[in-house]
Protein backbone atom coordinates (compact mmCIF):
# COMPACT_ATOMS: atom_id res chain seq x y z
CA UNK A 1 0.00 0.00 0.00
CA UNK A 2 1.42 3.34 -0.95
CA UNK A 3 3.04 5.27 1.87
CA UNK A 4 1.13 8.51 1.41
CA UNK A 5 -2.37 9.90 1.60
CA UNK A 6 -4.36 8.92 -1.46
CA UNK A 7 -6.91 11.63 -0.71
CA UNK A 8 -4.21 14.28 -0.83
CA UNK A 9 -2.99 12.80 -4.10
CA UNK A 10 -6.45 13.28 -5.60
CA UNK A 11 -6.74 16.83 -4.31
CA UNK A 12 -3.25 17.86 -5.37
CA UNK A 13 -3.04 16.05 -8.69
CA UNK A 14 -3.35 19.22 -10.70
CA UNK A 15 -0.61 21.12 -8.93
CA UNK A 16 2.54 21.48 -10.95
CA UNK A 17 5.78 20.43 -9.26
CA UNK A 18 7.51 23.38 -7.65
CA UNK A 19 10.65 24.55 -9.40
CA UNK A 20 11.37 21.19 -11.02
CA UNK A 21 13.61 21.36 -14.11
CA UNK A 22 12.13 20.08 -17.35
CA UNK A 23 15.19 18.13 -18.50
CA UNK A 24 17.24 15.36 -16.93
CA UNK A 25 20.24 16.49 -14.91
CA UNK A 26 23.42 15.50 -16.74
CA UNK A 27 25.69 15.72 -13.71
CA UNK A 28 23.50 13.89 -11.22
CA UNK A 29 25.11 10.68 -10.04
CA UNK A 30 22.79 7.70 -10.52
CA UNK A 31 22.51 5.01 -7.91
CA UNK A 32 22.96 2.18 -10.42
CA UNK A 33 25.23 1.88 -13.39
CA UNK A 34 23.42 2.58 -16.63
CA UNK A 35 22.46 -1.04 -17.20
CA UNK A 36 20.06 -2.57 -19.69
CA UNK A 37 17.25 -2.18 -17.16
CA UNK A 38 18.06 1.50 -16.72
CA UNK A 39 17.97 2.00 -20.49
CA UNK A 40 14.65 0.17 -20.64
CA UNK A 41 13.32 2.42 -17.86
CA UNK A 42 14.32 5.47 -19.90
CA UNK A 43 12.63 3.99 -22.97
CA UNK A 44 9.41 3.59 -21.00
CA UNK A 45 9.60 7.15 -19.69
CA UNK A 46 10.23 8.55 -23.17
CA UNK A 47 7.54 6.58 -24.96
CA UNK A 48 4.91 6.04 -22.26
CA UNK A 49 5.05 8.47 -19.34
CA UNK A 50 5.80 11.69 -21.17
CA UNK A 51 3.19 11.15 -23.96
CA UNK A 52 0.55 9.76 -21.57
CA UNK A 53 0.90 12.63 -19.12
CA UNK A 54 0.77 15.12 -21.98
CA UNK A 55 -2.42 13.43 -23.23
CA UNK A 56 -3.99 13.53 -19.77
CA UNK A 57 -3.26 17.24 -19.43
CA UNK A 58 -4.88 17.92 -22.81
CA UNK A 59 -8.17 16.28 -21.79
CA UNK A 60 -10.10 18.13 -19.04
CA UNK A 61 -10.67 15.98 -15.98
CA UNK A 62 -8.54 13.04 -17.12
CA UNK A 63 -5.80 13.61 -14.54
CA UNK A 64 -8.40 13.64 -11.78
CA UNK A 65 -10.05 10.50 -13.16
CA UNK A 66 -6.76 8.60 -13.30
CA UNK A 67 -5.74 9.62 -9.78
CA UNK A 68 -9.19 8.70 -8.48
CA UNK A 69 -8.93 5.21 -9.97
CA UNK A 70 -5.64 4.78 -8.13
CA UNK A 71 -7.18 6.02 -4.87
CA UNK A 72 -9.77 3.22 -4.93
CA UNK A 73 -7.01 0.70 -4.25
CA UNK A 74 -5.38 2.42 -1.27
CA UNK A 75 -6.08 2.05 2.44
CA UNK A 76 -8.99 4.46 2.62
CA UNK A 77 -10.66 3.06 -0.47
CA UNK A 78 -10.24 -0.58 0.55
CA UNK A 79 -11.51 -0.07 4.10
CA UNK A 80 -14.60 1.70 2.76
CA UNK A 81 -15.14 -1.03 0.15
CA UNK A 82 -14.92 -3.95 2.56
CA UNK A 83 -17.03 -2.13 5.13
CA UNK A 84 -19.74 -1.49 2.54
CA UNK A 85 -19.47 -5.09 1.33
CA UNK A 86 -19.79 -6.56 4.82
CA UNK A 87 -22.52 -4.29 6.17
CA UNK A 88 -24.80 -4.00 3.14
CA UNK A 89 -24.09 -6.69 0.52
CA UNK A 90 -22.42 -9.95 1.58
CA UNK A 91 -20.60 -10.88 4.79
CA UNK A 92 -19.20 -14.05 3.24
CA UNK A 93 -17.73 -12.25 0.24
CA UNK A 94 -16.05 -9.81 2.62
CA UNK A 95 -14.53 -12.32 5.02
CA UNK A 96 -13.29 -14.54 2.19
CA UNK A 97 -11.79 -11.82 0.02
CA UNK A 98 -10.31 -9.48 2.62
CA UNK A 99 -7.46 -11.90 3.41
CA UNK A 100 -5.89 -10.99 0.08
CA UNK A 101 -5.16 -7.44 1.25
CA UNK A 102 -2.55 -8.14 3.95
CA UNK A 103 -1.03 -11.10 2.10
CA UNK A 104 -0.59 -9.27 -1.21
CA UNK A 105 0.62 -6.04 0.40
CA UNK A 106 3.31 -7.72 2.48
CA UNK A 107 4.43 -9.98 -0.37
CA UNK A 108 4.58 -7.04 -2.76
CA UNK A 109 6.64 -5.01 -0.32
CA UNK A 110 9.16 -7.79 0.15
CA UNK A 111 9.56 -8.12 -3.62
CA UNK A 112 10.10 -4.36 -3.91
CA UNK A 113 12.85 -4.49 -1.32
CA UNK A 114 14.48 -7.32 -3.25
CA UNK A 115 14.71 -5.36 -6.53
CA UNK A 116 15.06 -1.82 -5.16
CA UNK A 117 13.99 -0.12 -8.39
CA UNK A 118 13.28 3.64 -8.35
CA UNK A 119 9.97 5.08 -9.47
CA UNK A 120 9.84 6.97 -12.80
CA UNK A 121 9.72 10.41 -11.21
CA UNK A 122 12.64 9.70 -8.90
CA UNK A 123 15.07 9.48 -11.81
CA UNK A 124 13.56 11.83 -14.37
CA UNK A 125 12.35 15.39 -13.63
CA UNK A 126 10.31 15.34 -16.85
CA UNK A 127 7.87 12.90 -15.20
CA UNK A 128 5.31 14.65 -13.03
CA UNK A 129 4.87 12.85 -9.70
CA UNK A 130 1.11 13.00 -9.13
CA UNK A 131 1.04 10.21 -6.53
CA UNK A 132 3.82 10.26 -3.96
CA UNK A 133 5.19 7.25 -2.11
CA UNK A 134 8.25 6.07 -0.20
CA UNK A 135 8.00 2.58 -1.68
CA UNK A 136 10.12 1.26 -4.53
CA UNK A 137 8.59 0.84 -7.96
CA UNK A 138 8.74 -2.82 -9.01
CA UNK A 139 6.21 -4.41 -9.02
CA UNK A 140 3.13 -2.22 -8.64
CA UNK A 141 1.19 -2.95 -5.44
CA UNK A 142 -1.91 -1.27 -6.91
CA UNK A 143 -1.85 -3.61 -9.92
CA UNK A 144 -1.03 -6.67 -7.85
CA UNK A 145 -3.77 -6.03 -5.30
CA UNK A 146 -6.46 -4.87 -7.74
CA UNK A 147 -5.94 -7.88 -10.02
CA UNK A 148 -5.91 -10.35 -7.12
CA UNK A 149 -9.18 -8.93 -5.78
CA UNK A 150 -10.71 -8.73 -9.27
CA UNK A 151 -9.86 -12.38 -9.95
CA UNK A 152 -11.21 -13.55 -6.60
CA UNK A 153 -14.48 -11.61 -6.82
CA UNK A 154 -15.02 -12.56 -10.46
CA UNK A 155 -14.88 -16.26 -9.53
CA UNK A 156 -16.95 -15.64 -6.40
CA UNK A 157 -19.60 -13.77 -8.39
CA UNK A 158 -19.75 -16.46 -11.06
CA UNK A 159 -20.13 -19.30 -8.56
CA UNK A 160 -22.58 -17.55 -6.21
CA UNK A 161 -24.57 -15.18 -8.44
CA UNK A 162 -24.12 -16.46 -11.98
CA UNK A 163 -23.14 -14.66 -15.14
CA UNK A 164 -25.46 -11.72 -14.49
CA UNK A 165 -25.70 -10.55 -18.10
CA UNK A 166 -25.75 -6.81 -18.75
CA UNK A 167 -28.02 -5.29 -21.44
CA UNK A 168 -25.08 -5.74 -23.84
CA UNK A 169 -24.80 -9.47 -22.95
CA UNK A 170 -21.42 -8.93 -21.26
CA UNK A 171 -21.10 -10.77 -17.91
CA UNK A 172 -21.10 -8.33 -15.00
CA UNK A 173 -18.06 -9.91 -13.38
CA UNK A 174 -15.91 -8.53 -16.22
CA UNK A 175 -16.39 -5.16 -14.52
CA UNK A 176 -13.97 -6.33 -11.83
CA UNK A 177 -11.26 -6.84 -14.44
CA UNK A 178 -12.03 -3.50 -16.10
CA UNK A 179 -11.60 -1.76 -12.76
CA UNK A 180 -8.29 -3.56 -12.13
CA UNK A 181 -7.05 -2.52 -15.57
CA UNK A 182 -8.07 1.10 -14.95
CA UNK A 183 -6.30 1.14 -11.58
CA UNK A 184 -3.15 -0.31 -13.14
CA UNK A 185 -3.07 2.11 -16.08
CA UNK A 186 -3.69 5.06 -13.76
CA UNK A 187 -0.38 4.37 -12.04
CA UNK A 188 1.49 5.08 -15.27
CA UNK A 189 -0.48 8.29 -15.83
CA UNK A 190 0.36 9.35 -12.26
CA UNK A 191 4.08 8.82 -12.83
CA UNK A 192 4.14 6.24 -10.04
CA UNK A 193 5.03 3.10 -12.02
CA UNK A 194 6.55 1.85 -15.24
CA UNK A 195 4.41 -0.23 -17.64
CA UNK A 196 6.44 -3.32 -16.73
CA UNK A 197 5.62 -2.72 -13.06
CA UNK A 198 1.90 -2.91 -13.66
CA UNK A 199 2.17 -5.82 -16.12
CA UNK A 200 4.18 -8.00 -13.73
CA UNK A 201 2.16 -6.81 -10.74
CA UNK A 202 -1.10 -7.60 -12.51
CA UNK A 203 0.15 -11.03 -13.58
CA UNK A 204 1.23 -11.91 -10.04
CA UNK A 205 -2.03 -10.58 -8.62
CA UNK A 206 -4.06 -12.65 -11.06
CA UNK A 207 -2.24 -15.84 -10.02
CA UNK A 208 -2.59 -15.07 -6.31
CA UNK A 209 -6.32 -14.35 -6.65
CA UNK A 210 -6.83 -17.60 -8.54
CA UNK A 211 -4.83 -19.61 -6.01
CA UNK A 212 -6.66 -18.01 -3.10
CA UNK A 213 -10.08 -18.89 -4.47
CA UNK A 214 -9.33 -22.39 -5.73
CA UNK A 215 -6.67 -23.64 -3.30
CA UNK A 216 -6.19 -21.59 -0.14
CA UNK A 217 -9.83 -20.80 0.63
CA UNK A 218 -11.12 -24.41 0.33
CA UNK A 219 -8.23 -25.61 2.50
CA UNK A 220 -8.91 -23.12 5.29
CA UNK A 221 -12.65 -23.76 5.12
CA UNK A 222 -11.95 -27.45 5.68
CA UNK A 223 -9.52 -26.60 8.48
CA UNK A 224 -12.06 -24.33 10.19
CA UNK A 225 -14.76 -26.99 9.91
CA UNK A 226 -12.44 -29.64 11.33
CA UNK A 227 -11.56 -27.40 14.28
CA UNK A 228 -14.97 -25.76 14.69
CA UNK A 229 -15.09 -26.85 18.34
CA UNK A 230 -11.63 -25.44 19.01
CA UNK A 231 -11.78 -21.71 18.25
CA UNK A 232 -8.60 -21.00 20.20
CA UNK A 233 -6.71 -23.38 17.92
CA UNK A 234 -7.87 -21.40 14.88
CA UNK A 235 -6.94 -18.08 16.50
CA UNK A 236 -3.51 -19.33 17.50
CA UNK A 237 -2.85 -20.75 14.03
CA UNK A 238 -3.71 -17.45 12.35
CA UNK A 239 -1.58 -15.45 14.75
CA UNK A 240 1.37 -17.80 14.31
CA UNK A 241 1.21 -17.03 10.58
CA UNK A 242 1.05 -13.33 11.42
CA UNK A 243 4.15 -13.64 13.61
CA UNK A 244 5.95 -15.49 10.80
CA UNK A 245 5.02 -12.65 8.42
CA UNK A 246 6.44 -10.14 10.90
CA UNK A 247 9.71 -12.02 11.28
CA UNK A 248 10.20 -12.38 7.52
CA UNK A 249 9.35 -8.68 7.04
CA UNK A 250 11.92 -7.57 9.62
CA UNK A 251 14.59 -9.84 8.13
CA UNK A 252 13.93 -8.54 4.61
CA UNK A 253 13.97 -4.96 5.92
CA UNK A 254 17.40 -5.49 7.46
CA UNK A 255 18.73 -7.07 4.26
CA UNK A 256 17.29 -4.33 2.02
CA UNK A 257 18.61 -1.56 4.23
CA UNK A 258 22.13 -2.99 4.16
CA UNK A 259 21.99 -3.84 0.47
CA UNK A 260 20.64 -0.58 -0.93
CA UNK A 261 21.65 1.92 1.74
CA UNK A 262 20.37 5.47 1.86
CA UNK A 263 18.35 6.84 -1.04
CA UNK A 264 20.41 9.00 -3.45
CA UNK A 265 19.98 12.75 -3.16
CA UNK A 266 18.54 12.91 -6.67
CA UNK A 267 15.72 10.56 -5.69
CA UNK A 268 15.01 12.55 -2.54
CA UNK A 269 14.76 15.81 -4.48
CA UNK A 270 12.49 14.44 -7.21
CA UNK A 271 10.24 12.09 -5.19
CA UNK A 272 8.11 15.01 -3.88
CA UNK A 273 7.80 13.47 -0.41
CA UNK A 274 7.63 15.65 2.69
CA UNK A 275 10.84 17.60 3.38
CA UNK A 276 12.61 15.63 0.60
CA UNK A 277 13.15 12.88 3.19
CA UNK A 278 12.70 9.79 1.03
CA UNK A 279 12.95 6.58 3.09
CA UNK A 280 12.18 3.53 0.91
CA UNK A 281 12.90 1.10 3.75
CA UNK A 282 11.91 2.66 7.08
CA UNK A 283 8.57 4.22 6.12
CA UNK A 284 7.21 1.19 4.19
CA UNK A 285 8.23 -1.04 7.12
CA UNK A 286 5.44 0.53 9.17
CA UNK A 287 2.88 -0.21 6.45
CA UNK A 288 3.95 -3.84 6.17
CA UNK A 289 3.90 -4.31 9.95
CA UNK A 290 0.42 -2.81 9.89
CA UNK A 291 -0.65 -5.36 7.28
CA UNK A 292 0.61 -8.14 9.54
CA UNK A 293 -1.70 -6.58 12.12
CA UNK A 294 -4.63 -6.84 9.70
CA UNK A 295 -3.89 -10.55 9.28
CA UNK A 296 -3.80 -10.99 13.06
CA UNK A 297 -7.05 -9.07 13.50
CA UNK A 298 -8.75 -11.21 10.87
CA UNK A 299 -7.52 -14.37 12.59
CA UNK A 300 -9.39 -13.32 15.73
CA UNK A 301 -12.45 -11.55 14.35
CA UNK A 302 -13.51 -14.20 11.83
CA UNK A 303 -13.41 -16.94 14.47
CA UNK A 304 -15.30 -14.92 17.09
CA UNK A 305 -17.91 -13.36 14.78
CA UNK A 306 -21.45 -14.68 14.35
CA UNK A 307 -22.56 -14.14 10.76
CA UNK A 308 -26.23 -14.68 11.70
CA UNK A 309 -26.42 -11.85 14.23
CA UNK A 310 -28.88 -9.07 13.26
CA UNK A 311 -26.12 -6.51 12.73
CA UNK A 312 -24.62 -8.62 9.94
CA UNK A 313 -27.85 -9.59 8.22
CA UNK A 314 -28.70 -7.72 5.04
CA UNK A 315 -30.39 -4.36 5.72
CA UNK A 316 -34.07 -4.14 4.83
CA UNK A 317 -34.00 -0.74 3.12
CA UNK A 318 -31.73 1.67 1.30
CA UNK A 319 -31.95 4.04 4.26
CA UNK A 320 -30.69 1.35 6.63
CA UNK A 321 -27.86 0.58 4.21
CA UNK A 322 -26.84 4.23 4.09
CA UNK A 323 -27.04 4.57 7.87
CA UNK A 324 -24.91 1.47 8.33
CA UNK A 325 -22.21 2.86 6.05
CA UNK A 326 -22.21 6.23 7.83
CA UNK A 327 -22.26 4.81 11.37
CA UNK A 328 -19.77 2.04 10.59
CA UNK A 329 -17.25 4.36 8.96
CA UNK A 330 -17.60 6.90 11.78
CA UNK A 331 -16.80 4.21 14.34
CA UNK A 332 -13.92 2.88 12.25
CA UNK A 333 -12.42 6.29 11.50
CA UNK A 334 -12.82 7.42 15.12
CA UNK A 335 -10.96 4.43 16.55
CA UNK A 336 -8.38 4.56 13.74
CA UNK A 337 -7.44 8.18 14.44
CA UNK A 338 -7.51 7.66 18.20
CA UNK A 339 -4.69 5.11 17.96
CA UNK A 340 -2.99 7.18 15.27
CA UNK A 341 -2.91 10.20 17.58
CA UNK A 342 -1.16 8.14 20.24
CA UNK A 343 1.24 6.73 17.66
CA UNK A 344 2.13 10.13 16.24
CA UNK A 345 2.10 12.20 19.43
CA UNK A 346 3.19 10.00 22.31
CA UNK A 347 5.31 7.16 20.92
CA UNK A 348 8.97 8.08 21.33
CA UNK A 349 10.84 5.06 19.98
CA UNK A 350 10.63 2.90 16.89
CA UNK A 351 9.54 -0.30 18.66
CA UNK A 352 6.61 1.46 20.35
CA UNK A 353 5.58 3.08 17.10
CA UNK A 354 5.70 -0.24 15.26
CA UNK A 355 3.60 -1.86 18.00
CA UNK A 356 1.01 0.91 17.80
CA UNK A 357 0.95 0.65 14.00
CA UNK A 358 0.32 -3.10 14.37
CA UNK A 359 -2.54 -2.40 16.80
CA UNK A 360 -4.01 0.36 14.64
CA UNK A 361 -4.31 -1.95 11.66
CA UNK A 362 -5.22 -5.04 13.70
CA UNK A 363 -8.34 -3.31 15.05
CA UNK A 364 -9.85 -2.81 11.58
CA UNK A 365 -11.27 -6.36 11.07
CA UNK A 366 -12.79 -6.55 14.59
CA UNK A 367 -14.40 -3.15 14.08
CA UNK A 368 -15.89 -4.20 10.73
CA UNK A 369 -17.05 -7.64 11.90
CA UNK A 370 -17.80 -7.13 15.62
CA UNK A 371 -17.97 -3.54 16.85
CA UNK A 372 -19.89 -1.92 13.98
CA UNK A 373 -22.58 -4.68 13.87
CA UNK A 374 -23.10 -4.21 17.63
CA UNK A 375 -23.66 -0.49 17.00
CA UNK A 376 -26.16 -1.30 14.22
CA UNK A 377 -28.12 -3.52 16.58
CA UNK A 378 -28.09 -0.88 19.32
CA UNK A 379 -29.69 1.75 17.07
CA UNK A 380 -31.95 -0.68 15.21
CA UNK A 381 -30.48 -0.67 11.70
Language-model features, listed with the residues they occupy:
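Hydrophobic alpha-helical bundle signature of multipass membrane enzymes
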Residues: 2-192, 207-210, 214-219, 223, ...
Amino acid sequence: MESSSSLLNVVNHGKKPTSRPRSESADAKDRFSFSFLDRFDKFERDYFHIPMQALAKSIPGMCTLMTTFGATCTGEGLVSFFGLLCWTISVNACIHGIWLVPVVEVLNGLIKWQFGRPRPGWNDPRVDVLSTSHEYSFPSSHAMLSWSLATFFAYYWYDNVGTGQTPTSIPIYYAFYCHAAAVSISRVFDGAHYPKDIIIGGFLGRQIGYAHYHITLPYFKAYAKLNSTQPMMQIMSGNLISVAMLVVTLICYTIAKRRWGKAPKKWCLLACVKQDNLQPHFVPLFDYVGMCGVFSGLSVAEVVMNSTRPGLLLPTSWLDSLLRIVVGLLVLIGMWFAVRAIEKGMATNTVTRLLLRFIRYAQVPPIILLVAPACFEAIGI
